[in-house]
Amino acid sequence: MKILLLSKKNFRIFAILLWSLFAILCAGHLEAVENSAKEKKETRNGGEDLAAKTQNPVGAMYSLPFKFTFDYGADNGEATFLNIQPVIPVTIGDWNLINRVIMPLIHTPGLVTGTPEIPNPVPGNGATGLGDINYSVFLSPAEPGKIIWGIGPSVIMDTATDDQLGSGKWSAGPTAVVLIQPKPWTMGLLGRQLWSFAGDSDRANVNQLLLEPFINYNLEKGWYLITDMILTANWQADSSNRWTIPLGGGVGKMFEIGSQKMNTKLEAYYNIVNPDGAPDWSMSWTLQFLFPR
């Protein structure tokens, strides 16, 4: 087992992350207590309404997902990711600001291509630690119509604790999402384009497109079917190694532990197109704490 030794800078980063997660949990718990009567009604309806809210990327609901991903079939071995993805909504007048953060904890056995978290990996003997943190904020109508949308900026911060775990660059660009929710469906597309603007001059520039089409079909008693494919294009790579395109899906379930609303899902995807040496399969399990407003 490898032991990660943190510098003072990285220790401060971890401390800030831990305090942020604690604050999110406390705020969400207070929201859940204040809305307990409403949630009891949703529970009697089998959780379908709450499932639809959870499947809306710009829904005004506090949540704290933990997504564990296992990439299998890369030339250098299997990479694992634990993405901590808090969602913090803020309502300002007729608008919602949906703050979404992705904090990746990564183990990589060496250079692994074709992953969204590390667009331009460098050779090495493997590393374990914090990757580059992604922060996105979406401006979305507080009272959406039939077509739900959100748009805003996205930033990748150079926070990786090892060169093998990040791009070595600060990157930014636009992000947007559009979806519809005709019961029992949720269907939409999230997109993001990033360009690097600062960082290690010896590392390759970042020019990455991410497209995430998603479809959910809600069943009874909180069960649902899902496909949530993350397509990426590394515009810095040659055309034969540019795209990663997965195909697959999974199943999810809304449930409770005491009064705590929860969501879990299990997914598997096969990369029908991927760069040389990239993983063939990606399997993920998500556990999400929900704090409806």
Residue ranges and their predicted role:
Residues 33-293:
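Transmembrane beta-barrel domains of Gram-negative outer membranes and organellar outer membranes
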Residues 1-46:
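Cleavable N-terminal export/targeting peptides
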